[in-house]
Amino acid sequence: MLIDRFESLEAYFASPYVAGVSERLRIENKILEHGDAGLHAHCWACSRVEQLKINPVRTEYGLQWREALRCPQCMLTARKRFGLHLLAESMQPGAPPPYLTEQVSYSYVAARKHWPKLVASEFLPTLTQRLVQSQKLKFLTRSLRANARHEDMTALTLGDASIGGMLSMDVLEHIADTPAVLREARRVLVPGSPFIITAPFLNGSQSTSVRAVQEADGSIRHLLEPEYHGDPLDPAGVLCFYHFGWDLLDGLRNAGFARAEMVFPWDPHFGYLSEQNAFVAFA
């Protein structure tokens, strides 16, 4: 996988990666011409070439490929495939199984084929939620033994230094207490293991945009227009607290991670085009 890595905003802006944006856009516009023929690319999750659906979202900033290029076999979009691919490439040889912060999803089904002893969970604080999602999981995995696991990312039940990697895809922005999540991730990871985060990212901003805060009494105070993201577990959606800036790297370092960086893949061979990125920190 072709990927660029940066430890600061300054290094990012001074890089050939930023200078090469015009050429990448030229190639992506050529890919658009494939239309219904799709993009033939290697799906990491399926371990074979598939015809990915070309359906980028057009925004005021250009084409958004993050949730596009879905594989017709595993059903994973580019963002999901990239997250799992990056996790596999970042883990240490012989490491314990990783932890995925989602379970009732196609990502979990795909990940389990690569890590049979994978740990995975959802945020399901009530018994009713756990029962409902367990039924969905049984259908998704075609296993009557499947049960949804509840975890609060600010207070994990996992043991210290017990997992070989952690992948959180578009979850962190929905949790008010970011520092608690980062501390817990560092606690449960084996030294040298990766914590990989995908989340809304302001690639030109050092500072995180705080959209809402949770008060001591549990109430929510909105600082910006409320933004709700689609949630497969809740049709009402889930509130977004943050659009992260480069300062999340400092937060990871302050939580005890030895190294933190922002990574940007761009590799048509795997179906990873513009707007893919992830925070990566090593315990």
Regions found by a protein language model. Give the residues of each.
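Hydrophobic beta-strand segment of the Class I
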Residues: M166-L167
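A short His-aromatic
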Residues: D170-H174
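Conserved N-terminal segment of class I S-adenosyl-L-methionine
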Residues: M1-A155, G159-A161, A212, D267-F282
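S-adenosyl-L-methionine-dependent methyltransferase catalytic module, highlighting the catalytic core
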Residues: D4-A19, I27-A41, T141-S143, A148-H150, ...
